[in-house]
Structures are given as C-alpha cells and as structure tokens.
Amino acid sequence: MKIGFDAKRAFSNYTGLGNYARDTIRILSHYAPNNNYVLFTPNKNNNIRTSFIHGKENILVKTPETLINKFFTKFWRTKNIVNDLHKNDIHIYHGLSNELPIGIEKTSIKTVVTIHDLIFIRHPHLFNTIDRKIYYKKFKHACTVANKIIAVSKQTKKDIVKYFNISPNKITVAYQGCNQVFQSKIPELQKQLVIKKHKIPKDYLLYVGTIEERKNLLAFLKTIQQLPK
C-alpha cells in the first residue's frame, strides 16, 4: 500500500507540528515496513531531524514538478497536489497538520487528517481576524471530507464535534508520542555541570516550549502557589 503524507512541516517546522509529522512518518515506516511512504513537501530542506529517511527504501520524497507548482507552492499544496497523488498511485493520504487538499474528496483516495487543536475558535483573541477565517475554512473542510479524523486529545475531539458538527464516530483520539531523544539517561556529573553553569536552584521546574498566553503557563504557576509547602 502507498501512503502519502503532507510532509511540509516535517521538513520546515522544529516544534510541535514538525515533531508530530516526523515521529508519525518515522514510526510507521519502522513498524509497518511493507508499506511505501511518499512525503509530499514544497521544499526538501536540509534538516538533521529528518535524517532518519536516508537509506529508507520504503520512503520517497516528492516536491512540485511543474514550474507553476514550484513557484506557487501554496496553491500546489492546497489543490494541485491531488494530481501528483494520482500520478504516484497513492491509496491513503494523511494531512498531518489540520489540512486536506481541495478536490481530494472527489477521488478514490482515502483520507486521514490530524487535528491538533481548535484554539483559534476557543480563544479567538489570540489570533487576528483574517487568520481565524482561513483556519476555520481549512480545518472545517478537512474534517468534513476526511474519511477519518485523528484528534490529539479528548478535548480536541469534543471541539471538532461541537464547532464543526462532525460525528464523534469519525474521530479517533491518538495521543502524541515522545521521541526517544527525550528519554535519554543523563549522567549525574553532566547534570551537575549544567546546574552549576546556569545557577539552577535546588528546586526547579523545567518547561520545554514557547512562552505564549495560549500555553496556559500563568494558570500553571498559580496552581504551584497553592501547593502545600
């Protein structure tokens, strides 16, 4: 079976969406090696985090072929990519980051889309009006035409049902995994060197992520204050 991926963020994003895309491709290609995986991306950027694809016989990377698609990559990814999916005999196409191309629902290609959150609806003040309208149109289209939806949390599933009127039977909750790089055992000496270098106190909390209002860090800190000493 040939499975296609919207792999743009696997090559260009170094945070949540990129990690999800890379891990999904890496894990599937390893544990389901009999399938062929085709990664569709506007640009094949040099990315050390995608080095796992090198030497993988069941992974192929495809970029826009025609001049117009190379120049208008957003249009290619939004619509014209459907032609390339046909040319490559794709059986299943997975939109890894909230989107599916227009017109794919008119083909025989089965589709899956992963929805990470609908925060632009739940907290609209964090986004400008134009972005909210674009996101709403893209996300709703993907959820409507997809054969299957993956939600990364139960809350996201509830939001999809509530805001897009999608049947809950169409949605599967699959929590994002953790790359083994985050599970590495660090020698005690190395820990102490880092603690000394950065003057870290005895009691501390490590947060890995961007500092933004939508990350809810303020509520986290307020909760800590209420914990018993």
Residue map of PLM features:
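Carbohydrate transferase catalytic cores enriched for Leloir-type hexosyltransferases
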Residues: M1-K229
